[in-house]
Amino acid sequence: MARTTPIARYRNIGISAHIDAGKTTTTERILFYTGVNHKIGEVHDGAATMDWMEQEQERGITITSAATTAFWSGMAKQYEPHRVNIIDTPGHVDFTIEVERSMRVLDGAVMVYCAVGGVQPQSETVWRQANKYKVPRIAFVNKMDRMGANFLKVVGQIKSRLGANPVPLQLAIGAEEAFTGVVDLVKMKAINWNEADAGVTFTYEDIPADMQELAEEWHQNLIESAAEASEELMEKYLGGEELTEEEIKKALRQRVLSNEIILVTCGSAFKNKGVQAMLDAVIDYLPSPVDVPAINGILDDGKDTPAERHASDDEPFSALAFKIATDPFVGNLTFFRVYSGVVNSGDTVLNSVKSARERFGRIVQMHANKREEIKEVRAGDIAAAIGLKDVTTGDTLCDPDAPIILERMEFPEPVISIAVEPKTKADQEKMGLALGRLAKEDPSFRVWTDEESNQTIIAGMGELHLDIIVDRMKREFNVEANVGKPQVAYREAIRSKVTDIEGKHAKQSGGRGQYGHVVIDMYPLEPGSNPKGYEFINDIKGGVIPGEYIPAVDKGIQEQLKAGPLAGYPVVDIGIRLHFGSYHDVDSSELAFKLAASIAFKEGFKKAKPVLLEPIMKVEVETPEENTGDVIGDLSRRRGMLRGQESEVTGVKIHAEVPLSEMFGYATQLRSLTKGRASYTMEFLKYDDAPSNVAQAVIEARGK
């Protein structure tokens, strides 16, 4: 089957924003204008197409990033049809993992900001993730019809808070109730959308007289920004020559693709204004799969040889599984992005990460949670496969004759855990199954059994994250669970270096004995300097310990890292240097060296100034001015460090760093302090030494 849309006319984009910036409404309008949806879904009445899980419709927030395919030929039908694959991403900080996953497989992004609230803390988190994956992006300032809407203020915040270089592509005509349309700064015309047909048609008009001067000023800003794309254009511009519309667009596109500028558009999705022109900007300025660098990977040849795959149907098939979802009708759905080649339903592919073959039973293109079955997918496509057995988020699927492992995704460690138990014994097995399936869908969620208490523990990125997991168990798997008190994920570390720590395991009792003897140095690593949080250096000279026992020493120490000597929490940021020891020809064994290593580790850890680390959260509170003192006082009582505050239209924004252990139940307390008028966001920032009284209490509670 031949390709229907050339790959240069593909746009794989994410729509990303802070909660309540109106992102889901914006996506709904895109689906409406691209002709996919005939009735516009409103978030207010729980009918939005992209928010397809029941909880999302109830809570009005987007949890799972659904992938949807749409076609766009331009506001004035000026293009050949372009295929736009949209990945909707959640805006709540507990679901940052979903954003991270979608950023990994996108080519470009639209950042949606609220014209009143501007750049919010979650916007900054998403921005950092987009920077990490070098995703070219444009901005859409939404809600121009709301009280307090100010387009140019938000443009200023994109510069000051995100450190970006925003270039307005439009200006808003009026604001709040008086918002009527936008000025197109490339064409220097006003765009007026027809309210009678929900903005499907529009007219170009003259720029209002009272805006002429402002429009001219920002038009010059736009031209200057375009001219900076090349010396040739700059000379033309400085020589007083007019740049053509085509030259301007081409130059701006070049600068967006190299992440030098962020083009800013505006509108009101709710009032059907602006989304159409923003879609045109997606086509004009965001990359197709062939505009972004080839994806890197390593060959599965035992030597980890670097390799790459280009966005072409002629290269061997390679794809990345970026999301696993459970569908009530068909079971497991594996969402994947094809980077190169072609695959047909029925084909067998290789999961190169697990060295296992998988068969593509059926391939479906998703429109929110509606499915359309298709026979094949090609480079640049985003689709879902039904029937893959053992694929995890981040796995590579590829041609068995040309194996490659594409760059993996990195997932954050959970910071909060709770014990769960089924309300009835009969549900025990069902709960295990449900949690296993949910953990497969969401790599930032973990589940395990505590060996001492035999309880099932679940861990995640925040209270809301775990609430939703428990809620989904009930809804999707009919398992009611009792939930324990949240527990903090503490860590253990050392603060000084110790040398020549000896560990000896020797047993002589008739027959073959056991003998292992090691001497190690132990030292702290700079936090974050080693992704594993652990390094092992083998400095054995002259074979005093035979090479075959070295891995056993490493393993013995790694087993100790899982539950540290202080309070049984994982040990991080520690280095071990093995430099001496001895062995016995007959009595030495791997087990003996493992035990010797664990003895040395425990001994050394006690002497190396051990500390308990606690997770510190970055907390931002928005509160009415009159409650500022109470909110700050309460944060201080929670051992919070104030990092600054600023005045907003709606009150005061307070920045603080607070230990997670002090933040349980904060939502309720904040509500009562401010009569429900304040809101807050919280995200993991770093691990820091817990004060000695806190550490002592934690250690005693763990019975150490």
From Swiss-Prot:
Query: Chief localization class?
Result: cytoplasm
Q: What SUPFAM superfamilies would the database entry show?
A: EF-G C-terminal domain-like, P-loop containing nucleoside triphosphate hydrolases, Ribosomal protein S5 domain 2-like, Translation proteins
Q: Which PROSITE patterns match?
A: G_TR_1, G_TR_2
GO biological process entries = ribosome disassembly
- CDD domains registered for this protein in UniProt: EF-G, EFG_III, EFG_mtEFG1_IV, EFG_mtEFG_C, EFG_mtEFG_II
Q: Which HAMAP family match?
A: EF_G_EF_2_B (MF_00054_B)
Originating organism: Citrobacter koseri (strain ATCC BAA-895 / CDC 4225-83 / SGSC4696)
| Residue ranges occupied by any tr-type G domain in the UniProt entry | 8-290
- Give the lineage: Bacteria, Pseudomonadati, Pseudomonadota, Gammaproteobacteria, Enterobacterales
UniProt keyword list: Cytoplasm, Elongation factor, GTP-binding, Nucleotide-binding, Protein biosynthesis
* Claim: Nucleotide-binding is one of the keywords in the record: yes
* One Pfam family from the record: EFG_C
Cellular component terms (Gene Ontology): cytoplasm
Record's function text:
Catalyzes the GTP-dependent ribosomal translocation step during translation elongation. During this step, the ribosome changes from the pre-translocational (PRE) to the post-translocational (POST) state as the newly formed A-site-bound peptidyl-tRNA and P-site-bound deacylated tRNA move to the P and E sites, respectively. Catalyzes the coordinated movement of the two tRNA molecules, the mRNA and conformational changes in the ribosome.
Protein's name in the database? Elongation factor G
